Amino acid sequence: TTSASQEPSSSQAAEESKILTTAVGAELNTLYPLNMDVQNNIGTKLCYEGLVNYENGDIVPCLAESWEFSDDGTALTFHLKEGVTFHDGTPFNAEAVKTDFEFAHPNPNFSNISAVAKLESIEVVDEYTVTFHYPNAYFAYLMDFCYPETMVLVSPAVLEEGNYQSMNGVVGTGPYVYEEIVDGDYVRFVRNENYWGEQPYYDEVIVKYIPDASARLQALQSGEIDLIYGSALLTWDDYQQATSLPNIAGAVAE
């Protein structure tokens, strides 16, 4: 659900940063995918990416350009995109993928490991080719890689340093970079100028901490925030109330 605001003049638009402000009900104290909750999902999607995405019912390439299964269905090989770096300058390659998934599997300290737990081993074939081996064939192995809660890539340098659960350890390959946190108030992300893909529209994304649902809705109605995202943050009744107003538009995912 989004709030519309008055359009700036062309001269104003050239001078002002394009900023999107949204709100969540829980503080973003960690964005490490294997330990995050659903309300942290928006920050994870800004900063991290996986090998594949799920869009409109199809599995599509992201950091992997293509993939294939072995004849017996127990090995899944990904051919990786070249020339990608993490936010800290660490190269994205097959060794980085192997490091990431071996760090996560199996680790009882992480809450979101169901998809990772199925892995048997990971093989680096060459610099940009990696194979995941499984104990048996299973129809949903590729689908497992679509889940942002388990299958996005973190810089191996962050894993080695051990600060992957702090906000300073939010280092992925995504279109936005973590910039700052003000405890109890907001987290700010800025556009990744070295992003491998198309540059995002907004220069900055600010995620405010507003724990009360009524206060979040009032913030949307007043223009303090531009967006409320997800059923965990907005009831159906509140959605209907908000979208009945002339300055607020909404969309429902099927």
Predicted regions and their residues:
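Short, low-complexity disordered leader/linker segments with a strong preference
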Residues: T1-L20, D58, S66, F103, ...
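Short, well-ordered beta-strand elements
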Residues: E16-E27, E65, A75-F78, V97-D100, ...
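N-terminal lobe/hinge region of extracytoplasmic solute-binding protein
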Residues: A23-D71, E102, V171
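Short, solvent-exposed loop/turn elements at domain surfaces
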Residues: L28-N35, D58-V60, A140-M143, D185-R188, ...
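Aromatic- and charge-enriched surface segment that lines or borders ligand/interaction sites
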Residues: E65-N109, V125, T131, R216-A219
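Surface-exposed binding/hinge segments that line
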Residues: E68, S114-A157
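Extracellular/periplasmic solute-recognition and catalytic clefts
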Residues: A104, S121-I122, E179-V190, I206-E254
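Gly/Pro-rich hinge or "lid" segments in bacterial periplasmic/extracellular proteins
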Residues: Y147-P200, E204
